[in-house]
């Protein structure tokens, strides 16, 4: 109580947001929030200070407390239970602001997308040839990851080379028209030997045999003998190469010799592959007739037309299965519907190891019913041929009896 009768006001220290802990230990005082920090946390009054205050203390500080409480809602997102931590709403708002700032910075740094003209040029550089291996876009590296990948610098994509990967299959033959006819054989480990080559003739003055005929070979020695399958009913690589030289002389491009052979063999599957078969028509887009090519084949290296067609029998088999077109005369040869694809006379070349193997192998093997049907048809054809031939050496009526020959016996009836 002052001399003028007025009651002195209690001192109320101001708590700054920078020093929140300093005001907590001040006795007989009420904390106050500074307006400088709108986001600062306000600590509750000390309970010990409140309990130590006299009961007869004046209530002059009550308006101050109400002002402190009234300031609390002014703080954005104030929650006295968080004690200075951010609320979920404030955290979401901060994350959104950071994401928006990062998006703006990224859009300023990244270059713009290519124009439609550039995209049109990229699509214009696409390779439209469906038979060419490699990637479709011109800007990409020319590597094909299909069944037979090719690599840069490996030559033409339509010709086999050392960089192309082919599956190891039974009866794989090298390209017959290539200069090197040594098939690629995989070797395992470092146990690789020198391939077997005979060389020129040895001197004939050898007087002793030291057991060269009885020398036993191990697996490495056997692997060095790279044998090329040969069959008398299938044209050899030497004959195929000679035929190729003759066809090139006729004006057929070298890179289309295989296509010409497959097309001719497919035609012979319809009309027959004997020397008496009449070949009809011309090759697509050309004035070269099939009869010309067939005659050239018969006149080269003693190769028959059936041997030449049997060399491409596996390709003809795949072609008929892909196009679902069996030989045209399968009904006339009395084949059933289930065995119609075996109704051609060089069917034996489909499973021969001497015939040219397709790059991806056979679509399927012939069934046992197809094998039996083809063998039976072949026996019937031989029976009919023998029926038209006679065995008499003279033409006297007493000998022939007006008959061409004795009645043949069909062997399949025995």
Curated annotation (Swiss-Prot):
This is Capsid protein. Residues 1-60, 94-127, 148-212 are annotated as: Disordered. It is found in: Virion. One of its GO terms (cellular component) is helical viral capsid. Residues 1-14, 113-127, 153-166, 185-197 have a biased composition (Polar residues). Residues 15-27, 38-60 have a biased composition (Low complexity). The keyword Transcription does not apply. It comes from Apple stem pitting virus (isolate PA66). GO terms for molecular function: structural molecule activity.
